[in-house]
Regions:
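Core dinuclear metal-dependent hydrolase active-site scaffold
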Residues: 1-46, 115-168, 246-249
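A short helix->loop->beta-strand "cap" motif at the edges of active sites that frequently abuts
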Residues: 29, 83-90, 207-211, 236
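Active-site neighborhood of phospho(di)ester-bond hydrolases with catalytic His/Asp-centered motifs
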Residues: 32-36, 53-60, 94-95, 154-160, ...
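Active-site metal-binding motif and surrounding structural segment of the metallo-beta-lactamase
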Residues: 38-88
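Metal-dependent catalytic neighborhoods of phosphoester/phosphodiester hydrolases
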Residues: 67-75, 101-104, 222-230
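Acidic/polar short surface loop at catalytic or gating sites that assists cofactor/ion binding
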Residues: 73-113
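Short acidic-hydrophobic, aromatic-tinged amphipathic segments that line or gate anion-handling sites
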Residues: 113-117, 240-241
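Cap/insert and terminal regions of metallo-dependent hydrolase folds
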Residues: 162-245
Length: 249
């Protein structure tokens, strides 16, 4: 399993940057996790969009879905040019709510919508995927994702505050992609559906994850500052997200 960081910034992309998006590849599947602003421009460095097997959306906040409409339009054009069969729309797996967002996911013959929740398990190629609702604070659902293939486990934490029930879902993951939206110095007084870098590191350590990728960072953050606040994670390699970073499991 190979994970490529296509975007990691939030709430907006910095110069030459992109908000969240991760390409996950195995021998038989190519999946995009979230599709934020600038993600498609990065995806093209590794894969034509018409070779994607599925798109999984954690939730509908703009920084995670900004490029979805462009992806839909691009796939439609590639179908017109016979680069992707018209009878092979791209499945988009995403929450049902807000309904206005999920209803926009089917687009001509290019894309179809498939609902996700904690009761659903899907298979894409050799990947088995399950979901966990996270503590993201504003009432609309957000789902973490657990991807399993060839004995390896990737957990994408999406957006999450401190009250997500990770036990039994992320324990011992080979890689935990965990948000660290805030540094110590800009942490809000009350939790608002996000974690600090320090909290992300402590969480991964408590869960016994084999490696950690800290993401969902302001474009202005200096990587060495992020790294210094992640030192509580000692169980394995700690990666700080950057565009183009690839991790093999």
């Amino acid at each position: 399993m190979r994970i490529t960081v296509l975007g990691y910034q939030s709430p907006y992309p910095g110069p030459n940057g992109a908000t969240p998006g991760y390409l996950v590849e195995t021998d038989s599947a190519r999946i995009l996790l979230d599709c934020g602003s600038g993600v498609l421009a990065q995806l093209g460095k590794y894969l034509p969009i018409y070779h994607l097997d599925a798109l999984l959306l954690s939730h509908y906040h703009h920084d995670h879905v900004a490029d979805v409409g462009v992806l839909q339009y691009g796939l439609m054009v590639h179908q017109l040019f016979s680069q992707r069969p018209k009878d092979k729309p791209l499945p988009i797996y995403a929450p049902t709510q807000p309904s206005a967002n999920s209803q926009a996911l089917p687009y001509k013959q290019a894309t179809t919508f498939h609902p996700i929740d904690e009761t659903i398990q899907i298979n894409v190629g050799d990947m088995q995927i399950s979901f966990l609702r996270t503590d993201h604070g504003d009432g609309d659902p957000c789902f973490a994702m657990r991807l399993e293939a060839s004995g390896k486990v990737l957990v994408y934490g999406a957006d999450s505050g401190p009250n997500t029930k990770w036990q039994g879902f992320a324990n011992g993951a080979d890689l935990f992609i965990c948000e660290g939206t805030y540094l110590d110095q800009n942490k809000p007084e009350q939790p608002n559906g996000h974690l600090t870098v320090r909290e992300a590191a402590q969480l991964a350590e408590e869960l016994g994850c084999q490696s950690l990728l800290i993401t969902h960072l302001f474009a202005e953050y200096e990587p060495e500052v992020v790294k210094s606040q992640a030192k509580d994670y000692q169980a394995g390699p700690c990666h700080i997200a950057r565009i183009g970073l690839q991790i093999e499991l």
